[in-house]
From Swiss-Prot:
A motif (Nuclear localization signal) lies at residues 321-325, 388-392. The modification Phosphothreonine is found at T103, T240, T779. The keyword Zinc does not apply. It is an enzyme of class 3 (hydrolase). It catalyses: Endonucleolytic cleavage to nucleoside 3'-phosphates and 3'-phosphooligonucleotide end-products. It holds the Pfam family TUDOR. This is Staphylococcal nuclease domain-containing protein 1. Its main location: cytoplasm.
Amino acid sequence: MASSAQSGGSSGGPAVPTVQRGIVKMVLSGCAIIVRGQPRGGPPPERQINLSNIRAGNLARRAAATQPDAKDTPDEPWAFPAREFLRKKLIGKEVCFTIENKTPQGREYGMIYLGKDTNGENIAESLVAEGLATRREGMRANNPEQNRLSECEEQAKAAKKGMWSEGNGSHTIRDLKYTIENPRHFVDSHHQKPVNAIIEHVRDGSVVRALLLPDYYLVTVMLSGIKCPTFRREADGSETPEPFAAEAKFFTESRLLQRDVQIILESCHNQNILGTILHPNGNITELLLKEGFARCVDWSIAVYTRGAEKLRAAERFAKERRLRIWRDYVAPTANLDQKDKQFVAKVMQVLNADAIVVKLNSGDYKTIHLSSIRPPRLEGENTQDKNKKLRPLYDIPYMFEAREFLRKKLIGKKVNVTVDYIRPASPATETVPAFSERTCATVTIGGINIAEALVSKGLATVIRYRQDDDQRSSHYDELLAAEARAIKNGKGLHSKKEVPIHRVADISGDTQKAKQFLPFLQRAGRSEAVVEYVFSGSRLKLYLPKETCLITFLLAGIECPRGARNLPGLVQEGEPFSEEATLFTKELVLQREVEVEVESMDKAGNFIGWLHIDGANLSVLLVEHALSKVHFTAERSSYYKSLLSAEEAAKQKKEKVWAHYEEQPVEEVMPVLEEKERSASYKPVFVTEITDDLHFYVQDVETGTQLEKLMENMRNDIASHPPVEGSYAPRRGEFCIAKFVDGEWYRARVEKVESPAKIHVFYIDYGNREVLPSTRLGTLPPAFSTRVLPAQATEYAFAFIQVPQDDDARTDAVDSVVRDIQNTQCLLNVEHLSAGCPHVTLQFADSKGDVGLGLVKEGLVMVEVRKEKQFQKVITEYLNAQESAKSARLNLWRYGDFRADDADEFGYSR
């Protein structure tokens, strides 16, 4: 600490006190401060200076934890204003001081002046003049300092300043609150708005004690997202600093101690508050990282409201320069070329919930594991039935939901893959199986990180790493933030609700069960299915959602090359092109949603029939690509002509199974393909029902009279032969008659049987649904079945629009459509087909106005941008309408364009 000696007169005269200088580090009270020197290679020395000749009130003191009978001591009147007067005047400022007295206990008393010499402001006199301190009695009257203090005190009394004002000063006593009953509620109540505060103590570089204003809460605040070296407490009570702990503490002290700051309270951890301290001169969290005094910590970085990437960037800055705690840091070496690190690939298969199989541009297949996430796991495995074979996809809670989320988002689509790290192969241990080498990557589609989307829905968790482990996702902080949101919102794995149970019956190879299912599948016509596995080109395993069962399915009408088989004692080689046929089927249908028509079954309990994908018959496609031949059993099928035509075309190409086919060449006339144009052929329909997801059901106006006649005849028949109440036993998928609320009977289909009192039915001619007791149902007379007149309600969806994900916004759109078109005649044109239902444009019958375009104009829906050339004109019109709605801030757009930041994929909702 700097000092300068001032000489007096002769050696016999009184000694002149030595003037010393320092920087005020802390104000202990209205009459005591701590000064420090300039730092040189480490934290500087400090000393406490007590002001001579004056007395200020004592500040509040908390009772010692070791003395259970002791009580907290409150502020004395005017003690805190005196402390604040000095704090605002002196903290961080240079002062000079003289020591007049030193007690045997080492306490030093003296005079303090603001500035570099004693000509500056006398701090003791300023305190007394403001009425914040009193002159000590008993001093020599002829002492010049004492005389000046006496004058200052008289002036303060005359002006009624401070303690000399009217009243007892009780309003200056703080109501200090040392504890908070519910820290989590306290943090949430501030809604991450900055709170004014004073930093009262610095425990280490990243932990402080702060006084929150204006309510005087004294709280411990840990800086979100970082951790500085700490002071280890030894058994004898002493503290041992970790490397750079003292330097980090001084770095924070010199910038924040007893400064006015604002704190954003961000979260709560073990009764400690996590927050970010804001100061006009900068963000201490980022500064500590940048100077190499702190490291990022994963467990709290997700709550940092100013963006975790800023903290990672600051840490990288210090690592690259090997500053302080990073002096021995060695950067990981890159072992991948750029082309292998980033690439675009097509997703061919989803493996459970954390890995996918992609097809590279080279045609090779590669398994990619999603970085830093863990799929749902089975808890309490010891309680499981050891005799029961575990089926992870269905038996592990939320595994099926996670797989389905990935399947629906990714299968058949191109994704961007960024390899984050390669996990080396590991041998098996007693508790952990062996793992082969794994390529772990961040996979995005449409700018959305699939792992983050999965975590945000509570369908996966984030792996926790050692702090020095850099082998992690390049978007690790976003994953942590997504998990925090999922936990807060109780999504998926973090939900308090009962876990979903999937009772899926596997009837593959079970002849008895297959016989029971066969009639239902035959009557159902086309059934929805998901291809779970491809055994060969014509043999597949299907999951039927409505029936919740797994079946083995054989393609009808074709003879596909048989693949290699393992037989007892030998391996039977596969027929030529069997592998190509299997690969073709895999690439086309594996994990896709398809439609199947079951015709029969074989002796082994395998179902035989036709499989359709995107309107195409897989049997025909295999024949068309010369990977199968037509089987004679196809003669009885309605697809026989298509199969023969495809086979003839394949024969002419002489490829694959027809490579050695010999026939007289036939002149082939190739049709001239014309560029497809948008077809606008509007037909009159009657809108009968609008669903909550903005689909709608219509009746064809041209067949309306047939329905009216059928309904009239059916009701007359029922009136003549009424069903016996309670005699009908409903089964899912069956057609029946149901009595609607108007007391009339209508044709319906049973969708679900909860109990005899709760039967879910769908009115096939009108599109509405209802839950009825079985007493209001009856058998559908054969004379009025769907073979006589097919179901008249057809489901459609609006083309070129996206339905809002937000429940309230979607309700607004549905309400608008209900008001405009329900129970009215409109004009309908099919624009394109989809796996769910055809997408159409709908016009008002009188004005010919486009209903979907009207929704866009009102800002109730968004535009679905399609790439097909024939739709560009109408898409442009829709986009122009959307821009107009945006400009007018209508409905969805009332807060501007929300789509970039408010993606539902990440768990947000408006």
